[in-house]
């Protein structure tokens, strides 16, 4: 189980100040992050260390991360909001 302190910290780190990222990351950390396994939680925290401009390109699907694991997390976040 994820502690409230950790979730609150991640919530604030997920708020990037760029609306396009905020609408993806904030709901993800609230709704999905608590149910992730430890590996994916670490991966999400690593994603948050990336530059906003890089993440913007990845989430707008203009580019892909050179790191396959980070790209997998990007895809996981996008898959929850895109119609199937």
From Swiss-Prot:
Entry GO terms, CC: cytoplasm
GO biological process, one term: succinate metabolic process
Keywords of the record: Chaperone, Cytoplasm
InterPro entries: SDH, SDH_sf, SdhE_FAD_assembly_factor
Signal sequence interval, chain numbering: none
Major subcellular site: cytoplasm
Subcellular location: Cytoplasm
Pfam family, one: Sdh5
Domain of life, source organism: Bacteria
Family the entry assigns: Belongs to the SdhE FAD assembly factor family.
Cited PANTHER family: FAD ASSEMBLY FACTOR SDHE
Functional summary from the UniProt entry: An FAD assembly protein, which accelerates covalent attachment of the cofactor into other proteins. Plays an essential role in the assembly of succinate dehydrogenase (SDH, respiratory complex II), an enzyme complex that is a component of both the tricarboxylic acid cycle and the electron transport chain, and which couples the oxidation of succinate to fumarate with the reduction of ubiquinone (coenzyme Q) to ubiquinol. Required for flavinylation (covalent attachment of FAD) of the flavoprotein subunit SdhA of SDH and other flavinylated proteins as well.
Entry protein name: FAD assembly factor SdhE
Lineage: Bacteria, Pseudomonadati, Pseudomonadota, Gammaproteobacteria, Pseudomonadales
């Amino acid at each position: 189980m994820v502690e409230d302190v950790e979730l609150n910290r991640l919530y604030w780190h997920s708020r990037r100040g760029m609306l396009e990222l905020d609408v993806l990351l904030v709901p993800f950390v609230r709704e999905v992050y608590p149910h992730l396994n430890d590996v994916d939680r670490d991966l999400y925290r690593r994603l948050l260390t990336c530059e906003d401009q890089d993440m913007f390109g990845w989430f707008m699907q203009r580019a892909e991360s050179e790191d396959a694991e980070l790209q997998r997390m990007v895809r996981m976040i996008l898959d929850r909001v895109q119609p199937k």
